[in-house]
UniProtKB/Swiss-Prot annotation:
The organism's taxonomic lineage, starting at the top: Bacteria, Pseudomonadati, Thermodesulfobacteriota, Desulfobacteria, Desulfobacterales
Protein name: S-adenosylmethionine synthase
Gene: metK
A Gene Ontology molecular function term of the record: ATP binding
Residues the record lists as binding Mg(2+): D18
Disulphide bridges: none
Keyword Cytoplasm annotated: yes
Species this chain originates from: Desulfosudis oleivorans (strain DSM 6200 / JCM 39069 / Hxd3) (Desulfococcus oleovorans)
Length: 388
């Protein structure tokens, strides 16, 4: 019998304070890029009791009302009453916006700087990952954790569980045998709620309306453990309970800790920032390799120097599951995919207001127009070059 082990990943709802910040930052980006597709945006947000701060470096031929964007985002998330400690109508909005440094701009603008191609917006390393554990080629723990938090938000917004409030988290522990998910060992859900609901009702209703509708029944058994609001009470939450910052949930945003992370966040950054665009491309490359049947698991690393178009390194790790040598996989990646920043932006069509939906419930393993990197359109070409 092979090895049995547990692996855990977490997700958070859009009402978690760090996700409120991410949602605001990406709402600002979408508003700007919808008017100026070549805008340069690095928008950071901080939210706390009754206040939202936005700051950063923005260069754009656009006119936007930052306080209106902030308030509308907070309203859509669901902070609509002052008794939550954070209310879209009454919160203060403070802004401090500068222009992008000209020293950075000359390395990114095509035709400027030491190199004439559009270079990377910064140095850095980015990872992409895919595996065959789920239909969307994502790790099972983070996939199910996202499904739970999305369901938490849905049953709150549609009134099925009208005692829920926007802040919430999930955590899923999956038991693996021989590297494959076999069952769910533990589910943790913490959801902010109104003060008048009893603990027993909250626990029973969350199991019935959140967990059971989205987790496959064959993965649950009598030994599965459920921890629902395990402190017993979660009335104070959101920005009133914790200060929220853009970029504080980078593992939730990606692969739940399965697969490595280069450290750069995504939200509030226009696609000239390779932290975002190259991470999306890394996911696209890894997913197409797995979809092609070359490997069951794949991790891709790409790294850049600021102002330089060609990546300084490209690495493909098939994690012991490959049907071809990794050196051949790297060669195929370089032949099939153009990993220069401008080429990535053009290939994935990233100069569009598509970023708002990415800000909560994961940037990967999703469907729809906001997630072009999830396409497997190059799988057949990769399979052909691999000769399998």
């Amino acid at each position: 019998m092979g090895r049995t082990h547990l692996f855990t990943s977490e997700s958070v709802t859009e009402g978690h304070p760090d996700k409120v910040a991410d949602c605001i930052s990406d709402a600002v980006l979408d508003a700007l890029i919808s008017q100026d597709k070549n805008c340069r945006v690095a928008c950071e947000t901080l939210v706390t009791t009754g206040v939202a701060f936005i700051a950063g470096e923005i260069t754009a031929n656009a006119t936007v009302n930052f306080p209106d964007i902030v308030r509308d985002t907070i309203r859509r998330i669901g902070y609509t009453s002052s008794d939550m400690g954070f209310d879209w109508q009454t919160c203060s909005v403070v802004t401090s916006i500068d222009k992008q440094s000209p020293d950075i701009a000359q390395g990114v603008n095509e035709g400027d700087g030491l190199f004439k191609e559009q270079g990377a917006g910064d140095q850095g390393l980015m990872f992409g990952f895919a595996c065959d554990e789920t239909p969307e080629l994502m790790p099972a723990p983070i996939s199910y954790a996202h499904k739970l938090t999305k369901q938490l938000a849905d049953v709150r917004k549609n009134g099925v569980l009208d005692f829920l409030r926007p802040d919430g988290k999930s955590q899923v522990t999956v038991q693996y045998e021989d590297g494959q998910p076999k069952r769910i060992d533990t589910i943790v859900i913490s959801s902010q709620h109104s003060p008048d609901v009893t603990y027993d009702e909250l626990k029973d209703r969350i199991i019935a309306e959140v967990i059971l509708p989205v987790i496959p029944g064959e993965l649950l058994d009598e030994q599965t453990k459920y921890f629902i609001n395990p402190t017993g009470r979660f009335v104070v939450g959101g920005p009133m309970g914790d200060c929220g910052l853009t970029g504080r949930k980078i593992i939730v945003d990606t692969y739940g800790g399965m697969g490595r992370h280069g450290g750069g966040c995504f939200s509030g950054k226009d696609p000239s920032k390779v932290d975002r665009s190259a991470s999306y491309m890394g996911r696209h490359v890894a997913k197409n390799i797995v979809a092609a049947g070359i490997a069951k698991r794949c991790e891709v690393q790409v790294a850049y120097a600021i102002g330089v178009a060609q990546p300084v390194s490209v690495m493909v790790d098939l994690m012991g599951t490959g049907r071809i040598p990794e050196a051949d996989a790297e060669r195929i990646v370089r032949e099939v995919f153009d990993l220069r920043p401008a080429a990535i932006i053009d290939y994935l069509d990233l100069k569009r207001p598509i970023y708002g939906p990415t800000a909560a419930y994961g940037h990967f393993g999703r469907t729809g127009d906001s997630f072009p990197w999830e396409s497997t359109r190059r799988a057949d070409e990769i399979r052909g070059k691999a000769g399998i």
